[in-house]
Amino acid sequence: MAELACFCYPHLENDSYRFIPFNSLAIKCMLTAKVDKKDQDKFYNSIIYGIAPPPQFKKRYNTNDNSRGMNYETPMFNKVAVLICEALNSIKVTQSDVASVLSKVVSVRHLENLVRRRENHQDVLFHSKELLLKSVLIAIGHSKEIETTATAEGGEVVFQNAAFTMWKLTYLEHSLMPILDQNFIEYKITMNEDKPISESHVKELIAELRWQYNKFAVITHGKGHYRVVKYSSVANHADRVYATFKSNNKNGNMIEFNLLDQRIIWQNWYAFTSSMKQGNTLEVCKKLLFQKMKRESNPFKGLSTDRKMDEVSQIGI
């Protein structure tokens, strides 16, 4: 995750701003600079290579002292920064909006995936600039639309029906902020269209998840799509989701947290997010992740949860 101000800076032209991507040498200057505390939140002038991000964001970049940041000296950093600027320059950002736009925290990996989609000649985003910019505006939180299959970050498609597409995320292959744990495996499920879904299509998805992904929990981060994650990583997701929810409320970004379809979401996660929305503490909410829940009556006739061992998928073991 990183603020948009880590990728570009605003240049006032008439009554609105044009956004310009940072170059890696300017960032490198900023990372070596001694800057007064009072100037930590201001864009840094490298004198030689142009404007650099505010020094308060130093930890967002990979250095000898911090291996958890972005690999800003890779070509991918420039591609992501240029893509963000293209999207921001396609809309009008005024002086009253610029600070809130640049303070938005975005998923670096999501944006790298959009660059990868853009460069894939077989992908619809390669052929449609309008759809590409729409996808970026959704990714950076500027659009109220949800991420659907056409505008999704992408990955490897492992399941699709008339209503849903399930992607295996490819973060291990990334260059900007790769996942270093080689055991990482995670999926995302997007809706093909933002409209009501028939019961038969939901049933198809649930059957696929129970047969093939029984070692995973289906959760949501509240943004209109599902995530399929290892049970061992659920607590980590809970910490992140709770922190983001609290931060948004504190900053006045009252974004509706979408609980999605209770029949698809793991029972304990649904309880956790419902409790979070009611204003309970993280400790109270997380207890619900580890409680034994009363099994819901099966919402679909003919869809059994019982499987013989040789029928059960070994994915995730």
From Swiss-Prot:
Which BP terms from GO are recorded? viral genome replication
**Cofactor(s) it depends on:** Mg(2+)
Q: Which domain of life is it from?
A: Viruses
Offer an example of a GO molecular function term for this protein: nucleoside diphosphate kinase activity
Q: Per its UniProt record, what InterPro entries does this chain match? A: Rota_NS35_C (IPR048306), Rota_NS35_N (IPR048573), Rotavirus_NSP2 (IPR003668), Rotavirus_NSP2_C (IPR024076), Rotavirus_NSP2_N (IPR024068)
Q: Tell me which GO cellular component terms the UniProt record holds.
A: host cell cytoplasm
Q: Kindly list the positions annotated as binding ATP.
A: 107-109, 188, 221-223, 227
Query: What keywords were assigned to this record?
Result: ATP-binding, Host cytoplasm, Hydrolase, Magnesium, Metal-binding, Nucleotide-binding, RNA-binding
Location of region: RNA-binding = 205-241
Q: Does the keyword Metal-binding apply?
A: yes
Q: How does it assemble?
A: Homooctamer. Interacts with VP1; this interaction is weak. Interacts with NSP5; this interaction leads to up-regulation of NSP5 phosphorylation and formation of viral factories. Interacts with host DCP1A, DCP1B, DDX6, EDC4 and EIF2S1/eIF2-alpha; these interactions are probably part of the sequestration of some host SGs and PBs proteins in viral factories.
Hey, which family's this protein in? Belongs to the rotavirus NSP2 family.
The protein's job, in short, is:
Participates in replication and packaging of the viral genome. Plays a crucial role, together with NSP5, in the formation of virus factories (viroplasms), which are large inclusions in the host cytoplasm where replication intermediates are assembled and viral RNA replication takes place. Displays ssRNA binding, NTPase, RNA triphosphatase (RTPase) and ATP-independent helix-unwinding activities. The unwinding activity may prepare and organize plus-strand RNAs for packaging and replication by removing interfering secondary structures.
- This chain belongs to the protein called Non-structural protein 2
